[in-house]
Regions:
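Extended beta-strand/beta-hairpin segments
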Residues: 1-56, 68-127
């Protein structure tokens, strides 16, 4: 039998139309979504702000990787909840000052439903 080697690098494509200074309509694969600013920042509030979208991507990656690692460890995870609280330095996005790290602190909390014991959950957390 021939082993199939998966690609380690793949090309990702995304298109975005920007009908205003705050709204970005994104299309990736066959999925569309809108990134926008809230009304108080001259947006139309049709979607999460760009910085909120970055945190949403972190939540999505946390979910995907945690479930893959759980599967690798043989753990049954029936539900996962990710909660993120971040301290965001707005000076960069307001062009007040150039900053290196916009998120001064990110607290990421994961709650899950599983039949695994605490030792197995701890192993999942460290992986």
């Amino acid at each position: 039998m021939v082993a199939i080697r998966q690609k380690t690098t793949v090309k990702q494509r995304l298109e975005a139309d920007c009908p205003s200074q705050s709204r970005t309509d994104v299309k990736v694969r066959d999925v569309s979504f809108t990134i926008d600013e809230p009304l108080e920042r001259d947006g139309t509030n049709m979607g999460p702000a760009p910085t909120e979208t970055a945190l949403a991507a972190l939540a999505g990656c946390t979910n995907t990787i945690a479930n893959k690692v759980a599967h690798k460890l043989g753990l049954d995870v029936s539900n996962l909840h990710v909660s993120i609280v971040a301290d965001f330095d707005r000076r960069g996005v307001t062009l007040t000052e150039e900053i290196d790290v916009p998120y001064e602190k990110i607290e990421l909390r994961v709650e899950l439903d599983t039949t695994a014991g605490q030792a197995e959950i701890d192993q999942l957390a460290t992986e």
